[in-house]
Amino acid sequence: MSRRGPAEKKTVKRDPFYRNRVVNMLINRILKHGKKSLAYKILYRAMKKIQQKKKRNPLSILRQAIRRVTPKIAVKRRRVSGSAYQVPIEIKAPQGKVLAIRWLLEAARKRPGRNMAFKLSSELMDATKGKGNAIRKKEETYRMAEANRTFANFR
């Protein structure tokens, strides 16, 4: 048994412009090869594009997109007597938010388009409408969980 005790919870810092934790989480997921200033540029340009197109607060659109994509249930592989089952598990809110951000960025990267800011803004706007690849990923996960509901007792 470990003698260290429970790990301290890290406080998520806020980004300098919007003063929001979710924006900072998104920036840290956009980040590649330690180029944080580029990640800031990408996100702020995407937010500016959203502001120009929708004439609304881009932060509220971001929150709404994340809320729409956030899953409540996921599937986890579990080996039971030699065979692997996809077991549906409930997800807590913070983990769901992390998954939503990851899915939004994955979908934005796969999108055809000019640059990452354009692709990210388009994906966020589609997610608020209930469309886009991130929403499709959530629905696919829910379908998997529904199909494997019989294995829920293997948790």
From Swiss-Prot:
Subcellular location: Plastid, Chloroplast
Domain of life, source organism: Eukaryota
GO cellular component, one term: small ribosomal subunit
Coiled coil feature spans: none
Alphabetical list of InterPro entries matching this protein: Ribosomal_uS7, Ribosomal_uS7_bac/org-type, Ribosomal_uS7_CS, Ribosomal_uS7_dom, Ribosomal_uS7_dom_sf
GO function term, MF aspect, one: rRNA binding
Alphabetized UniProt keyword annotations: Chloroplast, Plastid, Ribonucleoprotein, Ribosomal protein, RNA-binding, rRNA-binding
Gene Ontology terms describing biological process: translation
Family note: Belongs to the universal ribosomal protein uS7 family.
Subunit and interaction comment: Part of the 30S ribosomal subunit.
General function of this protein: One of the primary rRNA binding proteins, it binds directly to 16S rRNA where it nucleates assembly of the head domain of the 30S subunit.
NCBIfam families, per the entry: rpsG_bact
Name of the featured protein: Small ribosomal subunit protein uS7cz/uS7cy
Organism: Pelargonium hortorum
Gene name tied to this protein: rps7-A
